[in-house]
Amino acid sequence: MFHMIAYASMRTDIPAFYSDWLVRRIEEGFVMVRSPYNDHLIYKLPFNPEVIDCLGFCTKDPGEMIPHLDALKNWKTLWHVTITPYGKEYEPGVRDKRDIISAFKNLSLRVGKDRVVWRYDPVFLSPLFSISSHKIWFSTLSSLLEGYTDRVIFSFLDIYPFLKDNMQRLGIRAPEKSEMEELALFFVEEGRKHGLIVSSCAEGHWMKDFGIDTSGCLTKDVWEKCAERKLNFPNKKGKRGECNCILGFDIGGYGGCGMKCVYCYGRNYDRNEVHNPLSPLLFGWPRKEDEIKDVKAESWADKDGWLI
């Protein structure tokens, strides 16, 4: 049995670029996902709030989804919205940050600030962004988002091997340990001024003594708060050693993200030409040689375990 938490998506920005497709999947009540490990294996997952306990979103721009929020009125949702200080030189496809902040606030007013989390990541240093720059921007954004969320998550840049040459060309580097400590201490102190719980993502637990929540950004407690129910997870341990996060069933696919961030691990090759909002798959259509595997789906909600 697969996770009855669905995630849209760590692989590409579905809310920003594929909202019409997502709404159609909701209307038809199922979604297909091609395995990233086997190109001829497709999982078919029931896609309705009776079996999906929580639907998580990860996006740099929730604006395109706001007109579709009525389609999600019966769903329990959690939104991670990334707002960084970086400009077009690093995030060429991201709209003006003032528009993103406006969309963040609008989303918060519609779904509730407890369901919208601000992500300030990845944190890196470059000729354009110093320690001081991050302090100024984090303080500014914390002030602008005050009252619209109660949590901020940050992480430091991980440089994947296939990105190393590009990072060196742009002068981008991960902070040194002492620089991480300086920023982490500033983030937690500044965040508290604006009513924010400050959490780290997959950074281990070395910042716990700073007052930072290092448990993880998608833990059992987080998902239960989203579902408003106790959830009977088949495996209560997370998959990553750095945190206790429980990752949902990702309905996205790699490629096709128009943000084209220079630091992204999702590889920015263009798959828009194979996207069709009528297809049950995000990219392409099922092929005759594909194996389609029906996912056994059942809600994990404890029928007597209401949290509210």
Q: Language-model segments: which ranges?
A:
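Active-site beta-loop-alpha junctions enriched in small/polar residues
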Residues: R11-D13, K60-P62, T82-Y86, D121-V123, ...
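N-terminal [4Fe-4S]-dependent radical SAM core
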Residues: M1-Y7, P15, N48, G211-Y254, ...
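Local cysteine-cluster metal-coordination motifs and their immediate loop/turn environment
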Residues: F249-Y269
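A conserved mid-domain beta-alpha-beta active-site/ligand-binding segment of alpha/beta enzyme cores
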Residues: F162-F249
